[in-house]
């Protein structure tokens, strides 16, 4: 959110827009399930710069309270109930699967993907058997390239290495640059690897 706000403030001086991140929530943490299918719902922490300038600390505070408010069993159960009711709809049930797939992909590309400024997924700390650790340097995880002009970010950690990967359909690397520069300013050691040909991107 900080990097998105920085990018927007530099590009649009007259009009500011809310920035919103799409984040999946693993529902297995709250509702144990043996399904191998994705069992997630989405939350959208956001900052509205039209209300005033936000410091980094204020962004952290707002996101913290948003997550505490929305990520709880009652809200999540409501999402599950809504989705289950849609699946049980008799009209939807008789629609062929290939048509459903087309509709879902179109909905995501035209609406869902554009409903947020960026996507973020955090796999957390990955654990492996002790005998495997000496052979592993790090893990990487990537989100697919978004349909719209936005940036996706995926985070995973192993031992003392935190890996943050970006995927974007935008030529410029402004969001990534603001993000990593903030980490460096805060005294965090950063090693950057990129497949971009412009070495000055960061």
Regions found by a protein language model. Give the residues of each.
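Acyl-thioester-dependent acyl-group transfer interface
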Residues: 6-202
């Amino acid at each position: 959110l900080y990097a998105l706000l920085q990018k927007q403030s530099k590009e649009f001086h007259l009009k500011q827009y809310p920035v919103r991140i799409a984040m999946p929530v693993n529902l297995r943490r709250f509702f144990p399930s043996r399904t191998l299918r994705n069992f997630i719902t989405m939350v959208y922490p956001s900052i509205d710069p039209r209300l005033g300038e936000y410091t980094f600390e204020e962004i952290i505070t707002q996101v913290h309270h948003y997550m505490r408010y929305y990520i709880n069993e009652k809200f999540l159960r409501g999402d599950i109930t809504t989705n289950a009711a849609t699946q049980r709809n008799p009209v939807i049930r008789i629609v062929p699967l290939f048509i459903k797939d087309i509709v879902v992909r179109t909905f995501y590309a035209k609406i869902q993907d554009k409903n947020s400024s960026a996507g973020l997924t955090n796999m957390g700390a990955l654990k492996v058997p002790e005998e495997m650790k000496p052979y592993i340097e790090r893990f990487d995880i990537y989100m697919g390239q978004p349909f719209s002009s936005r940036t996706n970010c995926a985070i995973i950690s192993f031992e003392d290495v935190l890996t943050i990967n970006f995927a974007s359909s935008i030529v410029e690397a402004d969001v990534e640059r603001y993000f990593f520069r903030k980490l460096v300013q805060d005294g965090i050691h950063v090693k950057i690897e990129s497949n971009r040909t412009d070495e000055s991107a960061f």
